[in-house]
């Protein structure tokens, strides 16, 4: 597959998700948000406001020769001012996979292109001094200590709150 990040946002509000996904996913999105104990039922915001959500739009072209149900393994990383890499970001779900039981599995057809929103829960305080990435080798499950695939830098990450 080939992929590029086309948009990326940082927010503490799950209400912002509704502005990104197609209306057909609203009901499934609401169920997912309701399940998360770290999101306030009253405000829709993260209870621990030191944490954040990264909403990352990825344009993906599936270059495989056969249709597949692809499980996306991806983590968020940050390079902090000490120049060390940390893995504070966890993929919660992908917009087009919300209707599936597995929120990170998509059916892909050869030669087709997809615009997908990936929603990450990111632990720890956000800083403009850090550089943020997502794991770009979506099919390479890793133990986070030994990942050796490529990283996609989240350039122009727009901070909303």
Task: Report the location of each language-model feature.
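Conserved functional micro-motifs across diverse proteins
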Residues: 1-161
């Amino acid at each position: 597959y080939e992929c590029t990040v086309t948009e990326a946002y940082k927010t503490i509000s799950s209400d912002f998700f509704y502005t990104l996904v197609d209306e057909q996913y609203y009901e499934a999105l609401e169920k997912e948000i309701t399940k998360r104990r770290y999101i306030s039922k009253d405000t829709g915001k993260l209870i621990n406001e030191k944490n954040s959500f990264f909403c990352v739009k990825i344009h993906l072209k599936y270059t495989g020769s056969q249709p597949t149900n692809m499980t996306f393994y991806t983590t968020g990383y940050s390079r902090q001012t000490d120049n060390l890499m940390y893995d504070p970001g966890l993929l919660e779900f992908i917009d087009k996979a919300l209707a599936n039981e597995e929120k990170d599995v998509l059916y892909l057809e050869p030669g087709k292109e997809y615009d997908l929103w990936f929603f990450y829960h990111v632990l720890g305080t956000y800083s403009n001094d850090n550089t943020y990435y997502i794991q770009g080798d979506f099919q390479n499950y890793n133990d986070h200590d030994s990942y050796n695939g490529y990283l996609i830098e989240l350039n122009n990450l727009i901070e909303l709150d």
